[in-house]
């Protein structure tokens, strides 16, 4: 009887381990690739954070003009989100995103993220990352705009500048310029290559740069998702269009001056 119980427990353990492996694989299922802004991006699928949310390949596509569409969809009673990640890691330089969409009118539970993010060999969640996010984090009284720099060391605090804004139209440009000593954030009205029509700007320049600003190349992420996995309060699907992504290495920025 004892031997039967042992074998039974081992069989159940094998089943639980196998199920865990299957669930883990489902959460990090590799997605198909898409070409945008001169880079190859992997489209996310499966389920996981942030949120957590479900992520669907069908929520990402290019139109005939090679504009990138990201969508939060509601199908068969379930909500799903969109995320893409560059296959290549990028380092110091200017990261610029041109967006079509009324980001100032997002539902309180909608988040648009434009950011780099550490792979496991670079650091853990909550480190190294540089974020531009448009979100009210579920609270209608919060500002919509958020610039954030995460420290190199997990024990340190991130620094964030949040800001309110209203737009005259649906075209905006957002960028961060990252080097060893500072990060400059800018949000501008229209599709721009210059510094005109800035509606928000922040320079993050800490004293201990080696502890607060990463120097490690990282993939770029663009995602459109639901805060804590909550459906939009207005019950509507959300779509954002990116006209372009452009990365300019730091060495080329110096030559442009």
Kindly give the residue locations of the regions a language model identified:
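Bacterial N-terminal signal peptides that target proteins for export
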Residues: 2-17
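Low-complexity, Ser/Thr/Pro/Gly-rich disordered linker/stalk regions
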Residues: 30-112, 116-119, 126-138, 147-152, ...
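Tryptophan-centric aromatic hotspots in well-structured domains and transmembrane helices
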Residues: 97, 115-117, 176-178, 185, ...
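Short, aromatic/His-centered strand-loop micro-motif at the edge of beta-sheets
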Residues: 150-171
